[in-house]
């Protein structure tokens, strides 16, 4: 395909339509990219043991194949031949050596011999991988002397253009086996001295639209990537970053390193070729770059015209929240209480503005065509602001949890041990859809003395922004407005999740996919639930009028809630009874679509459910018949999500068995699953519902945002082998 083709518009357009939030405004140029050069370094091609990293190479080839299929012209510049050849020759030398030979000092192998062996091995791997993907590749070996020939450039372009027209992937490498260059490697001739500068030179000669350089780190950092204080630079501006960057150690292999990549990238971008340095360890870095996502470091000739970002970095936001939380903890209980009361008043005073911004979000959501259940969760209904303000006042009136003493023990005479509550530190809450969650979470964070970072969904951006503004406006300067930070850019989440030295707990509130992604991406403890697959079991002794009320409430009251009923289990003896038939008719009248498990499908001719482990979040549910209470328990423990489950029965023994054996965070008897809520439990509000078993479980209120510390009050005691210490370990009254 010639350079006048449609390029990768299909991929970019499709992705942009699917996920606008991922696209960064500074990366909009990718929509016009046609010809791409991808440079992959030795540290990416090989593993720590020097052998080929087949998983990374496979992911690389799959991405190249995808781009090739979409109409992009892709050129690959690869390193790794010397390393691969050295590994192969070491093995060959080992098998041909005697024990005596191995006792002698081992001389390093000639790099040119390693390159000669490694080039064929490396290219054979590329050929095999691309062939499996129905892609043809070609090898082109060059040296710096080739570019000294004035006619070489024309021949190079002619050959590469012919290959690209045939949809062949050109794979370039420096021909180290016959290169006449000697150390130190430097650009004394103005041509190239490693594969980074080769990639830059090829980008210029072949008129590439984009150069992607894959490294063993995620991009360019302000300092060594191993330094926690180093920050990734998403857009390089030479005037701003040129003198501030300090480079760490060079790559463990190869001749380049980040300094060489920066030099090559800066030169290429100065010539008008955008460059992105990104991680070659991620399986989708190239595709993300082509989606316009803010990953890696961008070098662009016009970057200095874009201006410096005035927004705080992820680390700066987290550190500011921690500092403000310490100021908050210094206040008296009454002063902290007053902040909450002021927030409640501010919400009510700004109700019209809040509902106006929320309506703007709703209008946009409906225009885009978001699912009705999502729009329902976004909606701030009439009376909701008053209800939220009331919840905040309830939280303010709760006993102050900070420094609350849980235990006092006399360890020895005049030596007293105390265990007290204290704040966790800084919380990161990532939530979808529900702007009212922002208010609840913020009030609980303030009451518990924690700093807070909030990231809401793009669909409720205006609602979240105005609520954040109103709440922080009520926080006094002595504490600081940055106590609660609002993260507006999705790309910042990845940076925040790396800050395990600053952020103490992550609470994701949203889909199973969101929670799973967060857990996989961070070392910070994560609290929350992935699914809300809640069950109601109607036992054979159930009062069917009661059952009807509970089931209708659990399903219809708020079907998008995580504590709404998703599966209705019924004792087999109730099949075809008047009470159950009446209940099913009422559900259908309310508009509930009922899907059947195998038994219900056969006996009631209901549409068959695909999986019992399914959360509808809408006016739909699953119905299945079970043999007895034990069968119901087994079903719930197998297919449930450990959220909230309920039994309806007049049999006390069956109820107790259910309550004790269902392994869920909340288990009810004769009560709707919709009661599983922090406010309804008297917690004032909740940051979420945890289905885990560590730290907190069920609706998480103020107590779940606290940890403990040990205080020991002595009078000069020393251990000294426990000589002279008489341990009493006597429990003391709490003060």
UniProtKB/Swiss-Prot annotation:
Residues 316-735 are annotated as: Gamma-glutamyl phosphate reductase. The lineage of its organism: Eukaryota, Viridiplantae, Streptophyta, Embryophyta, Tracheophyta. This is Delta-1-pyrroline-5-carboxylate synthase 2. GO terms for biological process: L-proline biosynthetic process; proline biosynthetic process. GO terms for molecular function: ATP binding; glutamate 5-kinase activity; glutamate-5-semialdehyde dehydrogenase activity. Pfam families: AA_kinase (PF00696), Aldedh (PF00171). Residues 1-315 are annotated as: Glutamate 5-kinase. Its EC number is 2.7.2.11, 1.2.1.41. One of its GO terms (cellular component) is cytoplasm. In the N-terminal section; belongs to the glutamate 5-kinase family. In the C-terminal section; belongs to the gamma-glutamyl phosphate reductase family. Keywords: Amino-acid biosynthesis, ATP-binding, Kinase, Multifunctional enzyme, NADP, Nucleotide-binding, Oxidoreductase, Proline biosynthesis, Stress response, Transferase. PANTHER family: DELTA-1-PYRROLINE-5-CARBOXYLATE SYNTHASE 2, GLUTAMATE SEMIALDEHYDE DEHYDROGENASE. Substrate binds at residues 79, 176, 195.
């Amino acid at each position: 395909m010639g350079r006048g083709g449609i390029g990768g518009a299909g991929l970019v357009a499709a992705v942009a339509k699917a996920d606008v939030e991922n696209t960064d405004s500074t990366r909009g140029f990718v929509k016009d990219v046609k010809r791409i050069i991808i440079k992959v370094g030795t540290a990416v091609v090989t593993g720590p043991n020097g052998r080929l990293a087949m998983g990374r190479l496979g992911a690389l080839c799959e991405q190249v194949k995808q781009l090739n299929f979409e109409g992009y012209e892709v050129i690959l510049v690869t390193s790794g031949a010397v390393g691969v050849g050295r590994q192969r020759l070491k093995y060959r030398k080992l098998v041909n050596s005697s024990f005596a030979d191995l006792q002698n000092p081992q001389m390093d192998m000639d790099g040119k011999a390693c390159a000669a062996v490694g080039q064929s091995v490396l290219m054979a791997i590329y050929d095999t991988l691309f062939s499996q993907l129905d892609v043809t590749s070609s090898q082109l070996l060059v040296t710096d002397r080739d570019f000294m020939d004035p006619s070489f450039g024309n021949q190079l372009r002619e050959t590469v253009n012919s290959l690209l027209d045939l949809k062949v992937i050109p794979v370039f490498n420096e021909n180290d086996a016959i290169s006449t260059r000697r150390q130190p490697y430097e650009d004394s001739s103005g041509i190239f001295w490693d594969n980074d500068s080769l990639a830059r030179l090829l980008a210029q000669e072949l008129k590439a639209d984009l150069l992607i350089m894959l490294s063993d780190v995620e991009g360019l950092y302000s300092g060594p990537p191993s330094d926690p204080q180093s920050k990734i630079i998403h857009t390089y501006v030479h005037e701003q970053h040129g003198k501030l960057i300090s480079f760490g150690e060079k790559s463990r292999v190869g001749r380049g390193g980040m300094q060489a990549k920066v030099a090559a990238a800066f030169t290429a971008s100065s010539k008008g070729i955008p460059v992105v340095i990104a991680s070659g360890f991620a399986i989708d870095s190239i595709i993300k770059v082509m989606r316009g996502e803010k990953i890696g470091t961008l070098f662009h000739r016009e970057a200095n015209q874009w201006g410096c970002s005035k927004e705080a970095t992820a680390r700066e936001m987290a550190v500011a929240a921690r500092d403000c939380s310490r100021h908050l903890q210094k206040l008296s209980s009454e002063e902290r209480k007053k902040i909450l009361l002021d927030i409640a008043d501010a919400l009510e005073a700004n109700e019209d503005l809040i509902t106006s911004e929320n309506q703007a979000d709703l209008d946009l959501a409906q225009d885009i065509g978001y699912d009705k259940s999502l729009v329902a969760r976004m909606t701030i209904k009439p009376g909701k602001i008053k209800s939220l303000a009331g919840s905040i006042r309830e939280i303010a009136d709760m006993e102050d949890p900070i420094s609350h003493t849980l235990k006092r023990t006399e360890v020895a005479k005049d030596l007293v041990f105390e265990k007290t509550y204290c704040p966790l530190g800084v919380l990161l809450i990532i939530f979808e859809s529900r702007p009212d969650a922002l208010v609840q979470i913020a009030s609980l964070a303030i009451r518990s003395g924690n700093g807070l970072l909030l990231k809401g969904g793009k669909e409720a951006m205006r609602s979240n922004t105005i609520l954040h503004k109103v709440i922080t406006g009520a926080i006094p300067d002595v504490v600081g407005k940055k106590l609660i930070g609002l993260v507006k850019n999705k790309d910042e989440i990845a940076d925040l999740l790396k800050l395990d030295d600053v952020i103490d707990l992550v609470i994701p509130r949203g889909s199973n996919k969101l929670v799973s992604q967060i857990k996989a991406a961070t070392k910070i403890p994560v609290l929350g639930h992935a699914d809300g697959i809640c069950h109601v079991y109607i036992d054979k002794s159930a009062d069917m009028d009661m059952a009807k009320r509970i089931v209708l409430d659990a399903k219809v009251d708020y079907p998008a809630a995580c504590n709404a009923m998703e599966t209705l289990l019924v004792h087999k003896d109730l099949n075809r009874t008047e009470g159950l038939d009446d209940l099913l008719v009422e559900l259908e009248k309310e508009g509930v679509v009922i899907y059947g498990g195998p038994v219900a499908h056969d006996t009631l001719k209901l549409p068959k459910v695909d999986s019992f482990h399914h959360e509808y979040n809408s006016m739909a549910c699953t119905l299945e018949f079970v043999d007895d209470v034990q069968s119901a328990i087994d079903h719930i423990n197998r297919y449930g999500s450990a959220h909230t489950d309920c039994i309806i029965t007049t049999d006390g023994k069956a109820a107790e068995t259910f309550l004790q054996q269902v392994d869920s965070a909340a288990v009810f008897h004769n009560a709707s699953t919709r009661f599983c809520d922090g406010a309804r439990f008297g917690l004032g509000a909740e940051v979420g519902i945890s289905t885990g078993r560590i730290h907190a479980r069920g609706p998480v209120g103020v107590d779940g945002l606290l940890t403990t510390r040990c205080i020991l009050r002595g009078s000069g005691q020393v251990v000294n082998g426990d000589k002279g210490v008489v341990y009493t370990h006597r429990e003391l009254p709490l003060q």
